[in-house]
Design a protein with these regions (language model features):
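Hydrophobic/basic alpha-helical segments enriched in Actinobacteria
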Residues: 1, 5-8, 12, 195, ...
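Active-site microenvironments in enzyme catalytic cores
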Residues: 6-172
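Catalytic-pocket segment enriched in acidic/His residues
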Residues: 124-253
Length: 253
């Protein structure tokens, strides 16, 4: 669909295959062969948190103010987890957090056609040790979740009116909760998508996570068994349990 015209998505959602999900059926991440990218340091609070975790390195301060945004690959095609699928924390990390984000879905020409909810699960201890470890802190098995569905831009609220809410639960109780406004983002959504499409071909389109302003305190780290719930105005709620990702396996296993 994302390799075609913008109207294709609306036609598909209005077609005979559309309808409620059968009870008990698993819900996958609402993407197919699209890669998931992410933008970093798009909110002031995110910049401050990255500076704190990185012992005062000023690279994050510079990218917050720069014309060119930070963009990185978050999940290979087919790797994002859907609703109620487990997200992972690395066994070789001791500080892991969810990053609740508005995800924009763009077609092959870079036109934003839909929104969904994204969770950019991250190892702050690995990234904080050295910024060059960013791919290991961000891109690993079960580090990305998307869902619960795609909402076409024609049916979604204006992003300026969207609010992101995060709740982390442990042992059935609320451990942490916070919320932020998408309107507080320093960069615009079309600006971020434009930078992503520069110099590369994305024939099936792409999903772009657009950053977060919700940063759990340093003493909080995700543990296996926790549950992460993210809600965005007009897009529903994405909920995922947390599991441990084994990092001791041999290559090729």
């Amino acid at each position: 669909v994302l390799g075609g015209d913008p109207d294709d998505l609306a036609e598909l959602l209005a077609g005979p295959a559309a309808g409620p999900v059968p009870e008990g059926a698993p819900v996958l991440a609402p993407v197919g062969g699209q890669p998931v990218w992410a933008a970093g340091v798009t909110f002031l609070r995110s910049r401050d948190a990255r500076l704190e975790e990185s012992s005062g390195l000023d690279a994050y301060d510079k990218v917050y103010l720069a014309e060119r945004p930070e963009l990185f690959l978050k999940a290979l095609p087919g790797a994002a987890r859907g609703p109620d699928r487990a997200i992972g924390v690395r066994a070789d990390s001791d500080w892991d957090v969810p990053e609740p984000e508005l995800a924009v879905v763009a077609d092959r020409r870079g036109r934003i056609v839909a929104y969904t909810i994204g969770d950019d699960v991250s190892s702050r201890s690995i990234e904080g040790e050295n910024p060059l470890y960013l791919p290991q802190a961000k891109l690993y098995r079960a580090s990305c979740a998307l869902g619960p569905c795609l909402v076409p831009v024609t049916e979604a609220p204006d992003p300026a009116d969207m609010e992101i809410a995060l709740v982390i639960e442990r042992d059935g109780a609320e451990l942490f909760a916070d919320r932020c406004a998408v309107a507080d983002m320093k960069r615009s959504l079309p600006e971020l998508v434009d930078w992503l499409w520069r110099g590369q071909d994305l024939p099936l389109g792409a999903v772009l996570l657009t950053g977060t302003s919700i940063v759990p305190p340093p003493e909080l780290t995700l543990r296996p068994g926790d549950r992460v719930r993210i809600a965005i105005t007009g897009l529903g709620e994405l909920a995922n349990p947390v599991e441990l990702v084994d990092t001791t396996g041999q290559p090729g296993r």
